């Protein structure tokens, strides 16, 4: 049974990461919104301009569009391809102001002689001949892909939401303890007293503790990365040792340039690890691995002389001063080491209609993207909104 609708009944999206915000944009572009123009409210613990927090993975992500979709996983492939198409068009239209950068991406494989077929859907795909393979690499491909500067992209989404709604979408920082709390007076004071038409749950790891959801299949996959400044690197590299296994297998090393000259180096995949701070040994290991796959990260002058100087004699160290010493020449380029918790879920993304919250409120779930949130965001958002419109017969 579809709930009765009118233009005064609000729709609530819970979560303001990449999944929640793309879902709101798709909702604003839907036939449902065009017909009813309902109030839309975003309720979230974390917002895009907050200080970095491991539990808000969207701003700590690299990020790049690099699908993990297995060849036989048509649903994930479709989500990822849709997202690439949307983002590639945004880059074509707005350039790097979009927070996106198009670049040559090279995938290096150790211990396997094949690649995911979805890479062949990208522009300029090619398999590298054996004569071009770096030492110890068994297989490699390259293609055009995209990297994302998360803070820029998320803020553009906020502006897009404001533009599409004429400023009518309301963003609330509020810790929602349970879905049933949407009927509490403190929430009604924010979203109005009309019955809620629908709730789209985009809470990532919050699904573990959100009452009415309490999804025990959710778990963190800890990722540690190192942010460096190396604007001369404008190509992306990854090295996969062993089976990818849906995105969480083997050892993966990556170099993700951003349009602003920052580079994200990674990484780790530590399932069930809630430690929110960088581990020094991990930082050193990431720097070592990054140099192995992208030696151009560190120009020759840094290898010979850890701290760049000038020809001016006044800038050199006196006999009483010691020149800085680095274990890795990349140390002098490091901005920060960061940790984020990927919102992983046994069985994969939960994207479905759940039981109605009451006889009048549709509930749609869109969470559990693990490390694939950025690369599947638009595809899953579009499907979540389609499920909502179907539930309300729009």
Swiss-Prot record:
Its EC number is 1.4.3.1. The chain crosses the membrane at residues 190-210. GO terms for molecular function: D-aspartate oxidase activity; FAD binding. Induction: Expression increases when grown on D-asparagine as nitrogen source. GO terms for cellular component: cytoplasm; membrane. It is a single-pass membrane protein. Glycans are attached at residue 214. Disruption phenotype: Decreases growth on D-aspartate and D-asparagine nitrogen sources. The keyword Glycoprotein applies. FAD binds at residues 19, 57-58, 62, 342, 373, 375. Its cofactor is FAD. Selectively catalyzes the oxidative deamination of acidic amino acids. Protects the organism from the toxicity of D-amino acids. Enables the organism to utilize D-amino acids as a source of nutrients. Enables the organism to utilize D-aspartate and D-asparagine as a source of nitrogen. May play a role in its interaction with the host. This is D-aspartate oxidase. It comes from Cryptococcus neoformans var. grubii serotype A (strain H99 / ATCC 208821 / CBS 10515 / FGSC 9487) (Filobasidiella neoformans var. grubii). The gene is DAO1.
